[in-house]
Each structure stands twice: as C-alpha cells, then as structure tokens.
Swiss-Prot record:
Its main location: membrane. GO terms for cellular component: membrane. Residues 1-26, 46-74 are annotated as: Disordered. This is Putative uncharacterized transmembrane protein DDB_G0290657. Keywords: Membrane, Transmembrane, Transmembrane helix. It comes from Dictyostelium discoideum (Social amoeba). It comes from the Eukaryota. Residues 47-74 have a biased composition (Low complexity). The chain crosses the membrane at residues 34-50. It is found in: Membrane. It is a single-pass membrane protein.
Length: 74
C-alpha cells in the first residue's frame, strides 16, 4: 500500500510539481485577472442590452464594483 502511493506521489510531484506548479501559479493569476475583466465586460454588455431587467442591471453593477475593489486590493 505504501509503496505504490509513495512512488506515484514522487512521480507526480517531481515530474510536474515544481515546474508546472510555478508556471501554473503565474499563468493562473494572469488568466484569473483576464477572465475576471472579460466577465465584467460581458456582464456589463449583457445588462446594458436588456434595459427591462432593472434588477439584473443593479445586481450586476454591485457585483462589478465589488470585483473591481477586490482586483485593486490584489
């Protein structure tokens, strides 16, 4: 039981741990920021197109403000 788990853990960790983890962290941060901005723009466009949904536009504006604050803090 301990042998295969140990081997698999070392293989996965040493094989793709350090390189993939570091690159994944940087790429993940950049992708998260870009995805958040694109989602904000898409949400604003969607809320602006249907003017009848006043509730949706108000909720989206509040969420976009909160997300912008979080992005600035980060």
């Amino acid at each position: 039981m301990n042998g295969p788990r140990y081997a698999h853990s070392n293989y996965g960790g040493n094989k793709g741990g350090p390189s993939n983890s570091t690159s994944g962290v940087f790429a993940g941060d950049i992708r998260c920021q870009v995805s958040n901005k694109s989602i904000m723009l898409i949400s604003l466009k969607i809320t602006n197109s249907p003017n009848s949904n006043s509730r949706g536009s108000s909720s989206s504006s509040s969420t976009s403000k909160s997300s912008s604050k979080t992005s600035f803090t980060q």
